[in-house]
């Protein structure tokens, strides 16, 4: 007899209802719950899957390189990065006939194409690539690497090459290898690539496999290093007149601390970036030699954590027990990793536009908008995932005995104080911010805009001034002519910083006013509300006043059994579910703010944002409605244009988003009745009734319907806004 799906759960495989399929899909990646799973086997499976993950990433990057080399215009773009539109790939079969072919034929080629808005052209150009051959070589190299990773994944599942449980639990060795090898060594290697290949290329000197051993990246070679004259490597940097990619105005420095931006490319100085990576690499290599492994020297993480107790005694046993708790809980580890990655991804979104490191990317406005939006959304998903796995940790892995009176236990004991404080902050921010917006809306609607309550963000302006922004007249730290800090920064370190922060050519410390003050507090409200939902979900995951034995029902339970009425919305899963909507709401406000402020600055019309962002109708009318015209006019009775595909995606995104509500607003009984009606009709329809199924149709559970609704809501929301950002920006700036 053929075994039914899912093979990993005999109980599910024998379920006579369609539950078998849906629960099988839902638990496919929940390795812990699979039949016959041991802790060692669990670690081995996850470890092997990492290689598969890396293979997918390398294959995807290889595909980018290959398609640009084959169908793109990289070599033409290199000659004129500001005017030529970078091509991602060709469109094989443009629908809607000749008008479509014409609309999508651009970028200096004779066939219809998609324009790249990911910034890969700028990245490849900055790191020293100049020809299609360079791209092909990179593509083939990554393809080979992907194959090696797939093989490694397979190999590490074979009995001879499976690491044992002790190997996975050896925290100090893993830290040493990851800090020194993964972060340290790779940072130094990247610094080496920048010094040996990218910087010479930016000065018009090509370094390839044929000559890289003969070309000195610096006139003195390694002499300055071994004689201790390290400052020689910073002498004679590129001048302000340097033309990127040529010898004109170029210097010989390889490791500098100039600060600010290259005047022509408006990106960070490559020599500053190389210096940064070298310093980071050296620090991490040191850090990777700090933990005790073979020779009994260095730190023991267990000793450090067990010793961490507040001298006042107010934190009980402090970090005692955390070493074992974290080491034995993959969910705890994943939660920490997701939280860290979430924060850093949001920082990437911020830094990619404020401190652009790739040549000319600051002037590709569509790419700037796309990259910011992309990274903020990714950060949102990662952060919510961190709390979800934190909650699963509390349900599945938390041991009250092991954590007696330590910081984890004490956090659970005073969770009411944490939750009520977050609740108070959210209410305070919400009522005050909305109150200001609504007041301003009313007075503007009645024709007296001068009666608006406009609050200058003086504290934020003071922080900008202390970093060197002179326009506010605060005379503090770097913006005070008499301060030691200003003299040091101008003459000793980062001399280009002050010029950059006070220049109108970049997005570094943009001028802020009452509109920024209000939207800042709206975003603070959204962040605190999202955090409240997530923190409450995790802290109540083991039990709450209404349901003290919640942990016994697992991470996601439906409304359970007699006398359990009203428990539909209190599983840890439901907190994650609700938080997702708030997360999307938060990222929406963040990206609306960033995009509108930048679009008005790029158009030389910053006044529009400043005047209209202080009341809600301004946001609806002058941001959303005004910028949606390219999407509404993407195609009409007169034909189509190059934005038509985004107009269609905008519509389609709305449709998917709206479909979500069908699942979100209806509960289980509706679906059971609908399915039974459909089955009845199916069985009485000629031809259709020849197709039978063995599984008894069972409707979606409440949790499943919510998931289906959430996925539609999320995907539709993102499709809609992605199309809006790209089309509204491309419609203005090409």
From Swiss-Prot:
Cofactor annotation remark: P700 is a chlorophyll a/chlorophyll a' dimer, A0 is one or more chlorophyll a, A1 is one or both phylloquinones and FX is a shared 4Fe-4S iron-sulfur center.
GO terms, molecular function: 4 iron, 4 sulfur cluster binding; chlorophyll binding; electron transfer activity; magnesium ion binding; oxidoreductase activity
Keyword set, alphabetical order: 4Fe-4S, Chlorophyll, Chloroplast, Chromophore, Electron transport, Iron, Iron-sulfur, Magnesium, Membrane, Metal-binding, Oxidoreductase, Photosynthesis, Photosystem I, Plastid, Thylakoid, Transmembrane, Transmembrane helix, Transport
Enzyme class name: oxidoreductase
Pfam families (UniProt xref): PsaA_PsaB (PF00223)
Subcellular location: Plastid, Chloroplast thylakoid membrane
Keyword Transcription carried by entry: no
Amino acids binding chlorophyll a B3: 662, 670
Highest taxon of source: Eukaryota
UniProt binding sites for [4Fe-4S] cluster: 559, 568
Entry membrane topology: Multi-pass membrane protein
Residues annotated to bind chlorophyll a B1: 654
HAMAP family: PSI_PsaB
Name of this chain's protein: Photosystem I P700 chlorophyll a apoprotein A2
Originating gene: psaB
């Amino acid at each position: 007899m053929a075994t039914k799906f899912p093979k990993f759960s005999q109980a599910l495989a024998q379920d006579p209802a369609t539950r078998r399929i849906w629960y099988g899909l839902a638990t496919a990646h929940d390795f812990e719950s699979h039949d016959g799973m041991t802790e060692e086997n669990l670690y081995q499976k996850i470890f092997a899957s990492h290689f598969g993950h890396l293979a997918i990433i390398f294959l995807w990057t290889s595909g980018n390189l290959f398609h640009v080399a084959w169908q793109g215009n990289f070599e033409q773009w290199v000659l004129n990065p500001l005017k030529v539109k970078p091509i991602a790939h060709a469109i094989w079969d443009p629908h809607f006939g000749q008008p479509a072919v014409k609309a999508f034929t651009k970028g200096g080629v004779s066939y219809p194409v998609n324009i790249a808005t990911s910034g890969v052209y700028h990245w490849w150009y900055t790191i020293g690539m100049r020809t299609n051959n360079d791209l092909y070589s990179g593509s083939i190299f990554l393809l080979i690497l992907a194959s090696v990773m797939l093989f490694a994944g397979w190999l590490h599942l074979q009995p001879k090459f499976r690491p044992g449980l002790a190997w996975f639990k050896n925290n100090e060795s893993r830290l040493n290898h990851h800090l020194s090898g993964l972060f340290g060594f790779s940072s130094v290697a990247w610094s080496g690539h920048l010094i040996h290949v990218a910087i010479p290329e930016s000065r018009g000197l090509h370094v390839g496999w044929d000559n890289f051993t003969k070309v000195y990246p610096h006139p003195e070679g390694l002499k300055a290093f071994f004689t201790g004259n390290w400052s020689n490597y910073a002498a004679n940097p590129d001048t302000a007149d340097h033309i990127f990619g040529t010898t004109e105005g170029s210097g010989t420095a390889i490791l500098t601390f100039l600060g600010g931006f290259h005047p022509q490319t408006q990106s960070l100085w490559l020599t500053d970036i190389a210096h940064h990576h070298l310093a980071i690499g050296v620090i991490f290599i040191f850090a990777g030699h700090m933990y005790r492994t073979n020779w009994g020297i260095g730190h023991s993480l267990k000793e450090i954590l067990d010793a961490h107790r507040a001298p006042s005694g107010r934190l009980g046993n402090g970090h005692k027990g955390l070493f074992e708790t974290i080491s034995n809980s993959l969910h705890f580890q994943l939660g920490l990793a997701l939280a860290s990655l979430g924060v850093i991804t949001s920082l990437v979104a911020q830094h990619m536009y404020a401190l652009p490191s790739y040549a000319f990317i600051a002037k590709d406005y569509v790419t700037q908008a796309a990259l910011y939006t992309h990274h903020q959304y990714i950060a949102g998903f990662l952060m919510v995932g961190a709390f979800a796995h934190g909650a699963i940790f509390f349900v599945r892995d938390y041991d009250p005995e092991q954590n007696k009176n330590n910081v984890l236990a004490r956090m659970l004991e005073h969770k009411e104080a944490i939750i009520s404080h977050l609740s108070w902050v959210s209410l305070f921010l919400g009522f005050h911010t909305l109150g200001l917006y609504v007041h301003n809306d009313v007075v503007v609607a009645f024709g007296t805009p001068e009666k608006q309550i406009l609050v200058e963000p003086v504290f934020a302006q003071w922080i900008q001034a202390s970093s060197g922004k002179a326009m506010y007249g605060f005379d503090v730290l770097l913006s005070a002519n008499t301060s030691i800090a200003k003299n040091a920064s101008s003459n000793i370190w980062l001399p280009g910083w002050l010029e950059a922060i006070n220049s109108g050519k970049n997005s570094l410390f943009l001028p802020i006013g009452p509109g920024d003050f209000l939207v800042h507090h709206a975003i603070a409200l959204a962040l605190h509300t999202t955090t409240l939902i997530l923190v409450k979900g995790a802290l109540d995951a083991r039990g709450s006043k209404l349901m003290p034995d919640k942990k016994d029902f697992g991470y996601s339970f439906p409304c359970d059994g007699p006398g359990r009425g009203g428990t539909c919305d209190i599983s840890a899963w439901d907190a994650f579910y609700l938080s997702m909507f708030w997360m999307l709401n938060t990222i929406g406000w963040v990206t609306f703010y960033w995009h509108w402020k930048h679009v008005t600055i790029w158009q030389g019309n910053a006044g529009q944002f400043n005047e209209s962002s202080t009341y809600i109708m301004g946001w609806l009318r002058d941001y959303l409605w005004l910028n949606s015209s390219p999407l509404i006019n993407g195609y009409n009775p007169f034909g189509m244009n190059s934005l038509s595909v985004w107009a269609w995606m905008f519509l389609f995104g709305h449709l998917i988003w709206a479909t979500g509500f069908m699942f979100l607003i209806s509960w289980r009984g509706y679906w059971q009745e609908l399915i039974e009606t459909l089955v009845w009709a199916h069985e009485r329809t000629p031809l259709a009734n020849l197709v039978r199924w063995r599984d008894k149709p069972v409707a979606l559970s409440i949790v499943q319907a919510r998931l289906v609704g959430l996925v539609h809501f999320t995907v539709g929301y993102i499709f809609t806004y992605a199309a809006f950002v790209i089309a509204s920006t491309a419609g203005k700036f090409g």
